[in-house]
Structure formats: C-alpha cells, structure tokens
Amino acid sequence: MNASLVGLAVSCCAVGMIASQAFAAEPGPLDRAILPLQEPARPLSKVLDARNATVPPRFEVKAPDGAPNVVIVLIDDMGFGVPTAFGGPVSMPTLDALAQQGLRYNNFHTTALCSPTRAALKSGRNHQTVNMGFITELATGLPGSTGQIPNATAPLAETLRLNGYATAAFGKWHETAAWEASVAGPFDRWPTRQGFDKF
C-alpha cells in the first residue's frame, strides 16, 4: 500500500514538472487565422512569495512586423475615370502619390449609392448579402434591404483592429439606419462598433 502511494506521488511530481516545463516554454508566433487572437498560456510561477515574483509582460496584440499601412479612399459622386491616377483629366496630386506607392483596385461593383457601396467595400461582400440594398433611409425590411448590416459580418476594419492595427474612419458614414441613430443606441452598427477606434 505504501509503495503504491509513493509511486503515485512520484508520478504526480513527474507530471507536474513536465507540465510546468511545458508552460514555461517561450510562446511561438501568434496564430492569426482565427480572430480574436488568443492570449498564449502564461508560465506558472514557481515562487511562493508574491513579493518575490516577476510579473510576466502584459499580452498585447500588435500588427505583424513589416505590416503595411492600409488606406482606403472612397469618394462619392465621382466617376472611376475622373482622377489622373486612373487616366482621367482631373489632377489630384495627393491621390496620385498614394496610388503610385500602393495598390489600385479597378474591378469593384458599385451601386451608385453611398450606403451599399460602403457596405460592400467594408465587408468584401455583395451589398445585398449585408442587407444594404439601398441607402439606409430607403430600407424596405425585406431580405437584402433591411439597412442593418448583420452582426455576423466581419468588417475589414474589425479584422485589422483584431490584428493589432490602429483604425480610423473620416467623413460620412451613412450605414446606420435612421431608427438606430439616437443617443440611446443601439450602437452596434456605429463606426466605433464596426472596427474603427476613432471616427
């Protein structure tokens, strides 16, 4: 009986030592495939007196090393071929400079309405898939045109924010239904709940 208790105690100690070594291992790179990023397991403290313990660094999500800046420019009521950046006659030096250093996307469906275009650009989905068939004031309540972007939609800004980017939106929003735009909320379709730190 005593021999089996000693054997059990030795086994438990060995398992405990192996587990503590596993927890003490340096965390590897973060897996960014699933958001939000999960905090790596913290090492167990081996110090009994909290006054002598070393506090591990706080977990913070940061953008990956060398991550590019992401700037999206959406201008209402301007044709695709108007700016010189896309071969048009209107000189826009700042836009030209941004286009020279970045990527130009020229295959994007627009509805010629601001709310659906913004919703499609932000989500990467067809505007009706995210319930923005018209501008929010003309929402019908029918599928694809409720004027309420589903909470299950992952906006680009939220994806970037969860990967450690600082995000901001400037200018017109026009994606919150009129009946949700009050000081009482709901706020889940406001810019700061769609992934933007600042608006």
Question: Residues of each region from the PLM?
Answer:
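N-terminal secretory signal peptides that target proteins for export/translocation
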Residues: 1-5
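Bacterial N-terminal signal peptides
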Residues: 7-20
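Formylglycine-dependent sulfatase
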Residues: 17-199
